[in-house]
Each structure stands twice: as structure tokens, then as C-alpha cells.
Amino acid sequence: MIGKLKGVIDSYGEDYVILDVQGVGYLVHCATRTLQALPSSGEAAVLSIETYVREDQIKLFGFRSDIEREWFRLLQTVQGVGAKVALAVLSTLPPSDLANAIALRDKAAVARTPGVGPKVAERIVTELKDKAPAFANVDPAVVHLAGAVDDDRAPRPVKDAISALVNLGYGQPQAAAAIASVARDAGEGAETAQLIRLGLKELAK
């Protein structure tokens, strides 16, 4: 089994890179984000590798970090998610954003992945919710707030403030994290406008 490859970029395809390792060209499938981050042809590169062995073929999948590779494996434990969908998810969301989206139950963020419908997105955030904290530095208070919002238990000003930040262009995980942080300091009596103002300051840090 191949766990890592270190060589020189030979060429690129739509969803793969050919890595020249001492004269042998390895075709390695990668997420779009990974391909975009790799150097130009002729330059050195290192990839963590996941090897798939089938009766009729051997496929190599490459990642910039071991964490990204672990997410690739983890995603495929979800029903309906194979290697192609897992790569598509990692093309849409980097590991840190994916971990936050799962911890915060942000199905919409995962569903932005081409080929991932609402049902699969929901399975991903549901089935992996207990595993995300191992990869993400997510404040437990933020996770608690996300659960409260999802279950319609959060105070109205909190929900309205998060919605306002999302409407301003911030992602749901970012908005929830910012409002969760400032809501603790502002107290239970904080109004929506105050939370929005404080949330924007938090996001500007």
C-alpha cells in the first residue's frame, strides 16, 4: 500500500495530477482544492495517499495533509458517499470548514457540494456529528447554540442575529460562532441589533 508520494509534478488532468517519482509517473486523483494548491509542472510536491485496490484496477487518491485524507475516509463511512462524492465534498469545503459545518449541523453548507442532495447532506452531518470535534476546534458553546437554533430553542434575538449575518454574506458556521461568542458576554437580555453589531465586530477581528 502507498501512503505518501514525493516527486515532481509532471502534468495535470481535470481531476488528477501525474506525479513523477524517480522516473515513474503516478496518476493521483485529487480534490479540486488540492489540485489548485499544488505547484506548477516541474516543481516538487508531496501528497498523502489513499490506495484503492479493486479486481480490475488500482486507484490512488492524493491529499495535501493527513487530516484531509482522514476526512476522505470518514466521509465514506456515510451511506451513499463513495470516493467521488467524498472528493467533491472536500473540493467544496476544506477540512476545517467541513468539521465546523458538521459540528454546527449546517446541512446547507454540505449540500452546496455538486452531486450532494439534501438527504445525503443530512446524513453526513448526522452520522458524523460525534466525530467532527476530533478534527475541529469548535467551541462547545457554539455547538450547543447551533443545536438550540436547529431545534428552535434559541432565543429569538439570537436566531434573528444569525440570520442577519448570513444575509450579509457570512457562512452559517461563521455567523453562529460569532453570535454564540458575543451572546455569552451580552447576557440573556441582549437585543437583535446589539448582537448583530457585536457579531460584526467579532467577525472583523
Curated annotation (Swiss-Prot):
Chief location bin: cytoplasm
Organism encoding this protein: Afipia carboxidovorans (strain ATCC 49405 / DSM 1227 / KCTC 32145 / OM5)
Domain notes: Has three domains with a flexible linker between the domains II and III and assumes an 'L' shape. Domain III is highly mobile and contacts RuvB.
Entry protein name: Holliday junction branch migration complex subunit RuvA
GO biological process: DNA recombination; DNA repair
Any one GO CC term of the record: cytoplasm
Record region (Domain I): 1-64
GO molecular function, one term: four-way junction helicase activity
Subunit: Homotetramer. Forms an RuvA(8)-RuvB(12)-Holliday junction (HJ) complex. HJ DNA is sandwiched between 2 RuvA tetramers; dsDNA enters through RuvA and exits via RuvB. An RuvB hexamer assembles on each DNA strand where it exits the tetramer. Each RuvB hexamer is contacted by two RuvA subunits (via domain III) on 2 adjacent RuvB subunits; this complex drives branch migration. In the full resolvosome a probable DNA-RuvA(4)-RuvB(12)-RuvC(2) complex forms which resolves the HJ.
Positions of region (Domain III): 154-205
Region Domain II: start-end pairs: 65-143
Function according to Swiss-Prot or TrEMBL: The RuvA-RuvB-RuvC complex processes Holliday junction (HJ) DNA during genetic recombination and DNA repair, while the RuvA-RuvB complex plays an important role in the rescue of blocked DNA replication forks via replication fork reversal (RFR). RuvA specifically binds to HJ cruciform DNA, conferring on it an open structure. The RuvB hexamer acts as an ATP-dependent pump, pulling dsDNA into and through the RuvAB complex. HJ branch migration allows RuvC to scan DNA until it finds its consensus sequence, where it cleaves and resolves the cruciform DNA.
Keyword field: Cytoplasm, DNA damage, DNA recombination, DNA repair, DNA-binding
Pfam families, per database record: HHH_5, RuvA_C, RuvA_N
Subcellular location: Cytoplasm
Keyword Cytoplasm: yes
Entry keyword Cytoplasm: yes
Family (UniProt): Belongs to the RuvA family.
InterPro entries: DNA_helicase_Holl-junc_RuvA_I, Hlx-hairpin-Hlx_DNA-bd_motif, NA-bd_OB-fold, RuvA, RuvA_2-like, RuvA_C, RuvA_C_sf
UniProt region (Flexible linker), positions on chain: 144-154
Superkingdom assignment: Bacteria
